[in-house]
Structures are given as C-alpha cells and as structure tokens.
Amino acid sequence: MEKDLSSLYSEKKDKENDETLFNIKLSKSVVETTPLNGHSLFDDDKSLSDWTDNVFTQSVFYHGSDDLIWGKFFVCVYKSPNSNKLNAIIFDKLGTSCFESVDISSNSQYYPAIENLSPSDQESNVKKCIAVILLQRYPLLSPSDLSQILSNKSENCDYDPPYAGDLASSCQLITAVPPEDLGKRFFTSGLLQNRFVSSTLLDVIYENNESTIELNNRLVFHLGEQLEQLFNPVTEYSPEQTEYGYKAPEDELPTESDDDLVKAICNELLQLQTNFTFNLVEFLQKFLIALRVRVLNEEINGLSTTKLNRLFPPTIDEVTRINCIFLDSLKTAIPYGSLEVLKACSITIPYFYKAYTRHEAATKNFSKDIKLFIRHFSNVIPEREVYTEMKIESIIKGPQEKLLKLKLIIERLWKSKKWRPKNQEMAKKCYNNIIDVIDSFGKLDSPLHSYSTRVFTPSGKILTELAKCWPVELQYKWLKRRVVGVYDVVDLNDENKRNLLVIFSDYVVFINILEAESYYTSDGSNRPLISDILMNSLINEVPLPSKIPKLKVERHCYIDEVLVSILDKSTLRFDRLKGKDSFSMVCKLSSAFISSSSVADLITKARILEKDTAFHLFKASRSHFTLYSTAHELCAYDSEKIKSKFALFLNIPPSKEILEVNNLHLAFFARFCSNDGRDNIVILDVLTKHDDKHIEVTSDNIVFTIINQLAIEIPICFSSLNSSMAKDLLCVNENLIKNLEHQLEEVKHPSTDEHRAVNSKLSGASDFDATHEKKRSYGTITTFRSYTSDLKDSPSGDNSNVTKETKEILPVKPTKKSSKKPREIQKKTKTNASKAEHIEKKKPNKGKGFFGVLKNVFGSKSKSKPSPVQRVPKKISQRHPKSPVKKPMTSEKKSSPKRAVVSSPKIKKKSTSFSTKESQTAKSSLRAVEFKSDDLIGKPPDVGNGAHPQENTRISSVVRDTKYVSYNPSQPVTENTSNEKNVEPKADQSTKQDNISNFADVEVSASSYPEKLDAETDDQIIGKATNSSSVHGNKELPDLAEVTTANRVSTTSAGDQRIDTQSEFLRAADVENLSDDDEHRQNESRVFNDDLFGDFIPKHYRNKQENINSSSNLFPEGKVPQEKGVSNENTNISLKTNEDASTLTQKLSPQASKVLTENSNELKDTNNEGKDAKDIKLGDDYSDKETAKEITKPKNFVEGITERKEIFPTIPRLAPPASKINFQRSPSYIELFQGMRVVLDKHDAHYNWKRLASQVSLSEGLKVNTEEDAAIINKSQDDAKAERMTQISEVIEYEMQQPIPTYLPKAHLDDSGIEKSDDKFFEIEEELKEELKGSKTGNEDVGNNNPSNSIPKIEKPPAFKVIRTSPVRIIGRTFEDTRKYENGSPSDISFTYDTHNNDEPDKRLMELKFPSQDEIPDDRFYTPAEEPTAEFPVEELPNTPRSINVTTSNNKSTDDKLSSGNIDQKPTELLDDLEFSSFNIAFGNTSMSTDNMKISSDLSSNKTVLGNAQKVQESPSGPLIYVLPQSSTKHEKEGFLRKKQKDEPIWVSPSKIDFADLSRRTKALTPERNTVPLKNNDSRKYKYTGEGSIGNMTNMLLTKDASYAYLKDFVALSDDEDEDGKQNCAVGGPEKLKFY
C-alpha cells in the first residue's frame, strides 16, 4: 500500500513538473526574426545581473531617429565573449530586436551600407555594425508589415544602402548615463524580460433554442468548474502573515521603573485584551466552529456553508488570531515595564488594520442578518442560552469598539508616566505610531467643507480627498464601481519610491505616493501599508487619515484597454492599448506575500465585473494559466460592451463574418459529431483572420484543446503585427521609447540639491505635504482635482504684475533664422534640429511680419538684450464660449510662429561674453527640470497629446508660483501688453522641447551635413548646456528655464498642461485684480463653478451692516433688476420661467448664483464665484467701468440699500418641474443627485449639505436665498420705480411667509411680553423685520383697494403654535373663512413658522411623507401655475391665496392679490403622515387659535373626497373605534351658535353591527385614529364663529363621563361634528392645546 501511495505521489509530482513547462509567453518584437544559428539571445530568461555582466558592461548605446520607418530608436552594440563578434540589440517601436554575429566585413551582402557611412565613421566598427543591421532588418518586413509600420504611408519607401548608411552616421553616442544604468532602464521597462500571460477571458455564446439546449449544456459542462461567485471569500480573507513580532529584551531587565499607577494601567490594558481575546476564542470554539461542523454534515436544513460564511465571515478567525498575537505580546512585555508595553503595542497593533478593515467590510449588514438568522435557526444553534442575539452582535462588532478603549488606556499610560530622558524619544515614537494606526481606521478632525475633490461611494457617502489629479472618468458611476484591489508597488529604479496600484471594476489607476520615505521609514516601526489604508477608505467609506503622505494620480486606463503581463514573481507590466494614448507601466509588488499572477488574475476578474449583461461563469486551469469562461445568450452578447478577443460558439455554424462583427481575433465553433450527442466526439472549428482549422476532440479534452490553441494565438494577438491591435502595439513601444528618451534628457541635466529645492519651492502648492489636511476647494462638483489648482495657497501679493489676459506662462525661446537644407538630406538624416526647422517652414506666410513687429517693439536692443515675455494667453478650450473681446488662439497645429523675443545670428558667435556667475545661472536654469526617479517607468511628456490634446484632456492641477515666474530682469512691466501678441504658441515650443535628442557630445563630421546651419535651435542650445561656450543669451536662458520649470511642476512636460485649468487661475487672479472682471469673464467656463449646496441654508451675520456689505459686493449696480421680470404696477414680480431647463446652467440668476461665506477670508473667493456665475448670463452687457464703479463705491451702494432697507423682497417664481432638469455640463450631478434631492434635509448639519445656488428647482416650490434678497437691489433704478417695488415686495413677502392663520380669542390679547425663540436665524430675521416695519411709509398698503383689508397692528400674547406638520390629503371641499368675522389680522403674522428656515417650509419632507394612496396627481400639489380644479368652488377662487407650500406665479394683479385679504388658507401644511405624524410647536408672539386648529382637524379627518360623502374607500388597517350617530347628539344651543356634545366611544356587540354599512365607510387618514361611523345620515353643515364662552365649554366637558375623558382627543370627529366643531374658539376661554 505504501508503494502504491508513493508511486501515486511521485507520478503526480512528475505530472506537475511537466505542467510547469506550460506557459504563454509574449513576443519581445512585433516582427519575429529567426536567428542564423537557431539560438537567440532571448531564449534564456536572464536576470538583470546576467544582462549587466554579459552585455551591458561591454556595450555602447547609440540613439537615432528615422522619420521613414523606424522612428526613434536605441542601439546597443557589444562584443560577444564567445564568438568575438559584434552583436546588436535595437529598441524601437517594433519592440526589441536582436542581431547576433553581425558581419561587417567586405564580404557581407550589406556592405554597401558601410560604404555610405560618413568619412569619419568609416573606421568605426560600431557604426559599421549599426549600418549593417539597419539595412539587414529592412528585408525582414513583409509588404503588409511595412504598410503598418511606415510613419508616412503616402511617401515612397526609398530605403536603400545610402539611406541606411546616412541613418547610421546620424546616430549619436550616449554618454550621459553609464551603459550599465541605461541597460537597467531597458530591463526594468520590460523590453528585455520574458513576459507571460497568466489568465484570460473567453466568451461563450449560445442560442437559446429548445433544440440545442441539451447539447449546449453538455458542452458547457466540460468548460470547467462553474462558479457561483467571482471572488471566493475564504481565499480573499486569508490571514496576513506577520513579518514583525515583539521580542523581549535580551538582558531580561526592565527598561523602566514604574510606579503603582503606571503598573495598574498596564495591568488594565492586559486585562482588557485578555477578556476580549478569551471571548473571541470561546465564541469560535463553542459556537461558530460547532455550527460549521453541523452545517458541513448537513444537519441543519436550509443552512449551507455559503450562507453561514456570509453571516459569520472567515474574517472573525483572522481577527481572533491577531488578538491572540497581541495578547501574547502584552504578556511578554509587561514584566519589563511600560516602555516595552508601548513597543509591543506599536509592533502588533498595525496588524489589526487589515484584519479589522476586511472584517468591517464583511459585516456591514450583520445587525440585519443576525435577526433573520435567529428568527429561523434559533432552535438549532449551539448554546443558545448563552449566545443570544445581543451577545453575538457584541462579539462580532466588538473589535472596532475595543480599539477606542485601547487608545484611551494607552493615552492615559503616556500621560501618567514620567519617562527617563534616554527613553523619552523611543516612547514618543511608539506612542505616536499606535495613535496614528488607530486613527487610521477613520477619524475626521474637521467637517468636509466642499465636494470638488471628493469621491462618492456606492452608498452616496463622500470620502475625503484621495489623490491629486483624480481622473475625471472616475468622478461618476460610483453606484456601480467596485474596488477590486489596492496594492503598494515599488519603483524598480528607485527602491525608496512607493506607488499605489488601484484596481477598480472599471478602471486601473496608478498613484504616486509623494514623500513616501517620510512614511515608510527604515527605523523598524511597523505601520499599515498605504494600500490597506486606501482600501479601508474606499470599502468602508471612512476618510483618509491626516498623517499619510499625499497621493497623486500618475496614470489611469479603462479595464478593457489594459493588457497585463507577468515579468517575474512580483513584477507586472501594464500596457494600455489605445492608439496615441497608449502607455506602459511596470510595477513591482512591495509585499512578498502577494504574487504577480494573483494581481493579473484580479484584472481579468475586474473585466468580468464590468460586463453589463447576464452570464454563467466557468473556470478552468492548467499549470499557471487560468481560463475564465462567461457564457452569454446570443442576443445578450450582441449588446455586451466588454468582449474578449477570443470566443467559443456552441452549435452555431462557423462564419468569418462573426469575427468582423464582434472584433474577434480567434473564434471556436463547437458541436457534437452526431446530432443526438451520444458519442463524445466534438468537432472544433478554429477560425482566425489568417487561418482556420478543423479539429475533432473528445468532450473531456475540449477545454485543454482550447487552452493549447490560446497559447498559440494570445502571443499573436497581443505582440504581433498580425493582430488587429497592431497599431496599438506599435504605439505602446513607441511611447515607451519616448519615455526612455525623456528620462535620458532629464539625466543629462542632473538636478543639484539647490535646484531640487527651487523645484520643490515651485511645486510647493502642487505637491502634497505630509499632513493630509482638509482644505476648501472652490471647484465644481464635476471636477476631481486638487485644491491646489485653485491657487488657494498662492501669495496674494504676487499677482501684482500679472497681466489681464494671462492664463499660462509659456517658455520664451530665441528665434534663429534658419537656412534651407537639401530635401534628400532632410529625408535621410533629419535630426531634431532639422525637425524644428521643418516645423518653421510649414508657416512661411506668417514669418515675414514677425521681424517687423519685433523691430517696433524692441528696436535695436533686441539684438543684444532680448526681453522674454513673461506670459502668453492660453488657447481657449473648444468647449468654452468664444470671447467677443479677444481673439482666441488658434489650434496647436496651426498656431502662429511669432515670438516675442528674437536673437540675432550675431549673438551666436558671442560665446565668451558672459560673466562666470551668469554662465552658471544659465547652466543651472537649464537643469531646473530635474530628473525624477518616479518618471523612469512613467509616461513621456507628450504621449497622446500631439495635435489632438482635447481627446486626452482632463481637469488637472496647474500650480504657478506667480512670484517666481513674474521675475523679469530685462524687460519693464510696461512692455507686457505690447508683447502679448507676439508670443509663440505653446504647441511649437513644447514640440521642440520634447524632440531633444542630443544626449551627449558626439563627434559628427561636417561632411554628413552639406550645409552648416546659420543658427542653432533652442534644442541644440539646451542639449549643449553643459558646454559654456555654446550657451548664448544670458538674459533669456534663466527666464526660459523659469517658465519651463513652472510649466512642468505638476506634469513632466509643458505639453501636459491642461487647458481646463484656465478658469481656476482666472478666478484666483480676480481676487487681486477685481477691475479685470469683464476680461476674465469672457474666458470663464460655462460649467457651474460653485459649491453644490452653497446656499442651502442662509448664512447669518453678526450684524445687519455685515450682511448688507457682503451682499453688496456680490452684485454690481444696475444688474439685479434687469434679471427680474418686473412689468407694470399690477404685474406680479416673478423670475423668468419660460426658459428651457438646460438654460438654467447658462443663465443663472443673481439670486441663484451668490454664495455668502461665513468669514471674510472666504468672501473674496466667493465673491468672484458669484461674478462668474452671473457673468454667464450677463455676458458683455456690462463694462469694466461699471464693475469698477461698483467696487470703488461700495459705501454709496450700502447707503442706497439703507435708504430703502424696507425692501426685503421674497420673489415668487415658478420652478420648472424636476423631470425637465438636464444639466448637460455635469453628467455626474444627474447620476449622483437627481434621485438624492428629496432626501437632503436642510436641517442636517450645516457643513454636510449646502443649498445649490444655481439650481433653483432642486426642490419644488422652495425659495432660494430669502434672507439675502435684501442685498440684491438696483441702485441705478429711479426712485418711483424703487418705491413701487418696495411696496409690492412687502405685500408679497407677507403673503409668502404667512403660516396657516390662527387667531387667539380676544380675551388673550393682553399686554404680556413676547418670548422669542433662541434660534439665531429667527432672532436675526425678527430684528431685520422690526427695522423694516419702522421704516414703512404711509403707502404701505398701496394697491389694496379693499378698505376691509387693512391690517391693524395687534399685540398678541405668547402662545403655542404649530409651525410644521406632516402632509395631509388634499380634500375636495372648502369651508367658510373665520376671518370674515374678524376685523383684521395681525401685522406681524409673517414670523410664525419655522425659526430655522426663514423662507418656506421644507417641501422635500412633504415629498417623502405625502401619503399618495388616493392617487392624487402630483401636478395638483406641485404645479402652482395650473388652474384650480373643479373641487374648489369658483366663487372662492379670489379668496384663495398662494399656499405656503406651493410657490405660485400667476397673472393676477397686485391689487387683486391684496384685495383678497380675508383669505381661506388651505392648511396644506398641517398634514398627517400614514404612520408617524410629525409636528413642531413654537412659542412666539402669534399663535394658532383653537378654531383654526379645528379647521385643520376637520380637514385632516374629513371623510369626503371630491364632495362625495358616500364614496367607498378601502378599509383602514388600524383598530376600529365606534362612535354614536349624529342623530343621538344633544344640542345645547340652537341656530348659528348651536353646540353639540361629542360622541362617546362605546362597545357594540358584533351581532349588532351593520356590516353593509361598514363596507361603505370612508377611509381614515391616520391609522392611530381610525373611526367607523355606524350611521351617518345627517349631512347638515353648521356654520361656526369665533364667539363663544368659557361656561359653554366647561358645561360641555362636565356632561361627559369621566371614565372616557382620556379618550376624548383620540376619537376622530364625524362629518357633522367636524362642521359644528369649528365654533370651538370661545372668546375669553382657556385655549386647549391639541396635537395632530
């Protein structure tokens, strides 16, 4: 038996060894070359040390550029140690090509290329080798390959030996970097290593026909294991290995002598950890493990392992393990004193982070799930007496809560202990590390001020700032996005540099950790990985801790555009396959416990998650390769957006059209050999664009056959010119070579510490500091960018020299007069200098006027002292409105070549005319753009930009140090405006800077260039900056470096600057240059640029003057009334509402755009924001003069307001329906907030939600900026019109702000004091109102033609009043108005509701609570402009005011509105909710009287709908209370003042109930007061009055049975009693408080 077992294992081992040989390797070159000897240098998977020892130490590197075929390329030439012959490796857009044993003798068939070398290179064996291989590789290309590779397909390919010889002569030796270092860069870029694919996706397509269902199922059965879930929770929750552990001191002596208090604290810490750990262990042993065993044995019906693991995830095991380790560490450390206790905590507590993070994420819904579990399985769980629901929940939720206790104890230990001086530093370090780790679980020191750089999680929560330059593509779709993985990665060229790899379900993001060395210290302190912290922030929706380093997004790509290949066990290469935007990134995982294959597997899983159609999932593996198969129905597959390049079609006829339609590289067509499927033979047709096969296999081997075929086709698809993605592959390699070239350019000018400091100072606002503080950003909600883009940290005083039109500083370059070069030489040996000339020659028409303009500007001084222009207006984005004032810059391709500075050719000869200091300055300034190690595997500066920058444009941070870039030593400020028109556009300059190829001083004979250039280009100047003799123009070079550095702070090149930041810079410039308002507004974006909820709650001020001043600064004179629709005297004031919904984003009213900040420091920025929003509508109707007038005369403006301060308009307006809102500029707003708008409560914390000023109709009928409207006044308006507007607005304000009118009995109108609310908003409003009333004139009631409508001022005593209630049902009957019996209404009635909200009640609450069981149309309730419905009598329409809950805007004249003083207020605010009736009661100077409360009660409990008292409605769900019929009611009085006794609830035998009558009863609106009238035959209506007596009320109460008195308020009134009860307001009697 033992022999059998051992043989079995040995066979299995041999089989595994065979399987390890199976892998899928990608090609290093898109054109495979077969070596002459059959063995390639790449056959062996060499390590970096092998390459360095055998190749790089004996090699030289050359750099060249070919415009015809190869593009930019590098050549490595070395001598083979075996054959003593020259070998060569070429790196270019084809990949890596190796040429061994190159024959450079005269017998070589490629010797003609050597003959065409320049005379100086004829003796160089290296140049001979390069010439031979350049000619040798050309015949290896087929015509089809050549057509794809040619840079310019329109030109004829004249590639011959002379061309190859000239191209070899033009190659330059690279001496800036040692060959070993340069070889390492190629190695770490993945150009020399073998790349493997570990997993891929196969789409399986089937037709849903009954005839093929069974056959399809049989075929799918052999595709591998079917998975129920993509991520296996057991493997995902695998424990984290502890790399560090606490060890006791070796000398076994205490390091600290502790007193009794400190010892007690340490023992308390040990006791807490002991108890908690024992509880966890006991829970696992006695409950969870026992339950798992029973479930595995299938002893519990209905409970599977999957369900159990979902409720009790394996993370609890991991948490228990970490707590056990911590307990062991504490037990070991306590005998050695308090310092060792801190050390043990500092080492062990960081392991809590990952375990607790995953545990919290896995138990989010535990409270709900455990209730369901206990309900169904309480009788089968072990020890159910001990482990109750509360006990289990406390154990599962305990770990997070215990952390706070640990923190408190450790803080007490730190404060109570007096540390020895030698231990003070170590103790502080350990203590800080412990606190930082615990705080990393989620601590928000300050409220979130703004939302511009936040990320919305799936549940709608807002995270703190994640990273600078957050991609625009990731600002929305968070409801669907999932976080798949976050990993720390290391830069291969700099081990101290850390990056982050974030894998979402739809995007892969590469993030730089700025100043990572400050976090990952080498002192042995154990800290959580930043990847774990970010994962916790994303998964558990907690803010990032304040002490992690700043993050900056470097790259990102869509999940379906990325190709992942494995370089070794811990290194991966990510290639984005997207044309010109392609790039390549190499990442090495920092953790040794995570394999590269597992990360590559997650990329495949993320692609599966991104699929948007239904599928079945299968998994098959062979060796280290995993195949995921997703089975789609044919119709669903047609609409699928995530499609693999490989597909399997079941029982579908083969067709190559399917390849074209679905963009497939490979298609399998499988079917059984016989129709009945009895035999297991499967016919497999394999189709590609270039070949097809016909294979017959058994059904068991179908998946292995597919994998074998994929092993052949995957390298062709992803690394060959035969692929449909050949252009993308070429672009990846081309951009990779450009990136290496850019790195070498930076290395050639190494940055000294001094220039590093300068560069750091320049980018100080751009780069994050180590304190991750929360700052306010003034950007838009649709932009995820850093707060530094708003120039919040820029010195305010440095903008004094900023020109008005400046948006971006561009480098200024001297222009040289170029001479013509022969065409054939340009073709064959075009260098970067000739490229620059070629760019100049494209625009000969604009070049002549150039010197004339410059001569006028500079005169003769320009020859010797060229004055650089400081700034150039940036090209206006295509999506911005065209400026009528300034002419926009043309596109980059056609930009003008004019420059502001010209260097005469004579300057070229003055190589020694500078002082030593100036020469050093020129040199150092060229090195201002330092080489950063984080760019070694990064992107080239101009990748994907080219001539179409808008395709790649996203909002990013641009930081300018205005103090630095405004330095202008040689040009006065007065020349700024004259130079602005003569500045070279950004495109030409960035193009030239990026084409630098002079990496070293290379010997090039003059014979290779027939004509000597008369002038050198800037690139040549920069390329030879290290040679002082070749540096020219001491005045221009420092500025050139300055502006170049400023432009490259946040990106690697000036070409990476994004045009979308111009509005941010413009807004910052407005703070200092307010007089430039109109010029700035011409270029301002039309996107909403304000805080999303800026005006949600009106801001309050310390005094009225501050309110007026801050408001007056927002809107210049003469602008506000033009926005208002003011017509004749009888026209209601309203906003213009006939605009389309989309116009709201472009025509914002001043009311909707102003934002009043709470402090004066923020007022300036907010002021400019208000202007920006306003300017969008005002356009250029207002000049700078008007703006300046407003700014220079704020005092007069304030005085104007003071004179008419009674104008406090509350402007009614018609809000468009929410369904018509379409914010075309902000798709993320629609996705994130359109469904959320009804749940944002204005009584939330003020820092959470702010009213969006520009979106008037976020909530139907809600007024905007009621309190601030006093500041929106047109000073230039004539006095008569202003006075008229004052009178109208006062009346309208009263009507809008009136609550449901209620009146106290006259007996209560005494002189008792008025007790005001303590609410600050209410006090301010009350104060303002009193002053407004004091300034009223005798014309207060102008327009009110009804003398009975006069409103006497009646002082009212304090009383309770209902200021807010839940909604009630809209009824169909009306009642007489009690106010017809009153002489007037109180004058101060407008402040009787909602002390928190000074404009209107919150209608969003009504949207949520409105019980729409009667199917009442929304337009009846929310559309104020609609005509009254038939339920309301026509004769009462004039007396119907505009409801408080509905903002109306009708055509009634002001006189008509004021004449309706005696109005029947439909109490739509006193509304009942179905389940919970809510109300607010305030104690103010006016009160709701009993009779009006009775009206509200009658309306609430009215059973009639649309006037039909007998309408049958559904039965109420609450208990029934029976009331006596009206006929048995006694009446004490007759006639108008007749009163009746209230019915008493009685018990009725069920046998006496008329069930037919029950079925016809009306529905009760409130379930807690459902009543059933037994007989309701009396339909008489009783009029009511405000008169009554206390005696009548007292007699009525005394006649009742005391035993039923407590039920009185809970019994709803019947119809007749409702009517008669309205007289209940007895004069002089005590007011009875009623609740609804």
UniProtKB/Swiss-Prot annotation:
- Start-end of Basic residues biased regions: 872-885
Residue stretches of biased makeup (Polar residues): 965-980, 1044-1063, 1342-1351, 1440-1452
List residues, modification Phosphothreonine: 1045, 1157, 1429, 1440
| Glycyl lysine isopeptide (Lys-Gly) (interchain with G-Cter in ubiquitin) cross-link site | 792, 963
Specify residue ranges for compositional bias: Basic and acidic residues. Answer: 981-991, 1161-1179
Per its UniProt record, what InterPro entries does this chain match? Bud3_N (IPR021895), DBL_dom_sf (IPR035899), DH_dom (IPR000219)
Query: What are the record keywords, sorted?
Result: Cell cycle, Isopeptide bond, Phosphoprotein, Ubl conjugation
An annotated GO cellular component of this protein is: cellular bud neck contractile ring
Answer yes or no on keyword Membrane: no
GO BP terms: namely: axial cellular bud site selection; cytogamy
Q: Which residues are annotated as modified residue Phosphoserine in the UniProt record?
A: 766, 1063, 1075, 1134, 1149, 1160, 1228, 1254, 1257, 1390, 1412, 1443, 1501, 1549, 1589, 1614
Region (Disordered), start-end ranges:
789-998, 1025-1063, 1107-1130, 1152-1179, 1331-1354, 1435-1465
Q: A Pfam family in this protein?
A: PH_BUD3_C
Q: What ranges does the record list as Low complexity composition bias?
A: 912-921
Which GO molecular function annotations are given, in alphabetical order?
guanyl-nucleotide exchange factor activity
Sequence similarity: Belongs to the BUD3 family.
Q: What is the protein's quaternary organization? A: Interacts with AXL2.
Q: What does this protein do?
A: Co-assembles with BUD4 at bud sites. BUD4 and BUD3 may cooperate to recognize a spatial landmark (the neck filaments) during mitosis and they subsequently become a landmark for establishing the axial budding pattern in G1.
Question: Under which name does UniProt file this protein?
Answer: Bud site selection protein 3
> What is the scientific name of the source organism?
Saccharomyces cerevisiae (strain ATCC 204508 / S288c) (Baker's yeast)
